[in-house]
Regions:
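Proteins with a high burden of low-complexity, intrinsically disordered sequence enriched in S/T/G/P/A and R
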Residues: 1-8, 97, 245-248
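Rossmann-fold cofactor-recognition segment
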Residues: 5-19
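Compositionally biased, intrinsically disordered low-complexity regions
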Residues: 11-12, 123, 161, 219, ...
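Oxidoreductase cofactor-interface core, primarily capturing Rossmann-like NAD(P)-dependent enzymes
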Residues: 1-3, 18-30, 38-49, 53-62, ...
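Catalytic nucleophile serine of serine hydrolases
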Residues: 67-68, 233
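A hydrophobic C-terminal alpha-helical subdomain
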Residues: 188-250
Length: 250
């Protein structure tokens, strides 16, 4: 809503997930809530739990939450642990729920390459069933139109196939007509190469574990949930890139 306050019938309100009182005020009168996971930060778990509690106290009846494939207390992808804690808080809240567990986003793959067009990380030959954000949005929009039909269900949102990062690089190369490649770093190499960003340790752990989660096979499961819910097949990375980078007209 904050990005489109001009929509008919929409009222924009401001509240951060970690601000309980502001969230209570913002959620007053809300029956169905779409909770998009907060931006990555070291306090995200606390922010999420605060917001879920505020939703419960505000009287929200059904919460739809965008989580992560393989969310678990020991998730290889470190941020998946925050998603697990959030899911548990929702389950224990007494609110009706629908969980949308997203795979890694296909949209971000080109951005993961360096200026030299090399994707670097310890992913090996692991597979990822990358999903587009537009598919996740279509699923969420469909669910919100009839939440009762999706009550107490956890969906896995993926693309139509699982691919390696070497295949990702090849697909990007074809779409952009430029050469991209994948370099399979060791874990020590991955931590060393990311020192240049001078990022906090939790952030570097998240970056590196993006690749180790792929290497471990955590991201390989292909689900048909996107098509089942929306009636349209999930979009592939190649399809997304062709739409994002249309061929020039003669």
């Amino acid at each position: 809503m904050s990005r489109a306050p001009e929509l008919d019938g929409a009222v924009a309100v401001q509240a951060s997930y970690g601000d309980r009182e502001a969230s209570l005020a913002a959620l007053a009168g809300v029956d169905t809530l779409l909770m998009i996971s907060a931006a990555e930060n070291e306090h995200r778990r606390t922010e999420h739990l605060t917001f879920v509690e505020a939703a419960r106290y505000a009287g929200v009846k059904h919460i739809v939450y965008t989580s992560f494939v393989g969310a678990a207390p020991d998730s290889t992808f470190t941020l998946g642990r925050d998603h697990y804690a959030t899911e548990q808080a929702i389950f224990e809240s007494g609110m009706d729920f629908t969980i949308l567990r997203d795979n890694f986003y296909a949209d971000f793959m080109p951005q993961m390459a360096g200026e030299d067009h090399v994707l670097r990380g310890p992913a090996g030959d692991g597979l990822a069933a990358l999903v587009t954000r537009s598919d996740v949005a279509r699923v969420a929009a469909t669910v919100l139109q009839d939440v009762a039909a999706h009550r107490s269900i956890t969906y896995n949102l993926t693309g139509p196939m699982a691919i390696t990062l070497a295949e990702v690089a090849a697909i990007i190369s074809e779409a952009k007509d430029e050469h991209y490649s994948f370099h399979d770093e060791t874990i020590p190499e991955a931590y060393e190469s990311r020192k240049v960003w001078n990022a906090p340790s939790w952030q570097v752990d998240a970056w590196v574990s993006t690749y180790t989660a792929i290497a471990n096979g955590d991201m390989r499961e292909v689900s048909t949930d996107v098509e089942t819910i929306t009636g349209r097949p999930a979009e592939s990375l190649a399809g997304f890139l062709s739409r994002d980078n249309p061929a020039p007209r003669n």
